[in-house]
Amino acid sequence: MGFEIPEPYVWDESFKVFYENLDEEHKGLFQAIFNLSKSPADNGALKHLSKVIDEHFSHEEDMMKKASYSDFDNHKKAHVDFQASLGGLSSPVANDKVHWAKDWLVNHIKGTDFLYKGKL
């Protein structure tokens, strides 16, 4: 059972992980997925999403490594799996794939990222 996808699809305080840089990046991820949902045929929107995902995952993983975060391996695997699936997409992106990305981000933040609150 997952968390509810917000409508409109925007970051809100319920997604706060309490690391300002990560919260700002999460806002950017929401915006990138929202932009893709509005322009699924725009290859630039898909490339931008891939870029911000790569940058965010790198920053988040660096913070976890520096903190010797105990669940780093599982968390990184979730990132790798998402990136692999995202890399398989091409424009135009089907609505079900956009919905999948929205759902994944919501559930990843609230179900996985929340586990590192106060530990990084």
From Swiss-Prot:
Expressed in the central nervous system. Detected in the pair of large glia within the ganglionic neuropile, in the six packet glia that surround neuronal somata in each central ganglion, and in the bilateral pair of glia that separate axonal fascicles in the interganglionic connective nerves (at protein level). Keywords: Iron, Metal-binding, Oxygen transport, Transport. InterPro entries: Haemerythrin (IPR002063), Haemerythrin_Fe_BS (IPR016131), Hemerythrin (IPR050669), Hemerythrin-like (IPR012312), Hemerythrin-like_sf (IPR035938), Hemerythrin_metal-bd (IPR012827). Fe cation 1 binds at H26, H56, E60, D113. It holds the Pfam family Hemerythrin. Fe cation 2 binds at E60, H75, H79, H108, D113. One of its GO terms (molecular function) is iron ion binding. Induction: Up-regulated after septic shoc. PANTHER family: BACTERIOHEMERYTHRIN (PTHR37164:SF1). NCBIfam families: hemeryth_dom (TIGR02481), Hemerythrin (TIGR00058). Belongs to the hemerythrin family. May play a role in the innate immune response of the leech nervous system to bacterial invasion. The oxygen-binding site in each chain contains two iron atoms. This is Neurohemerythrin.
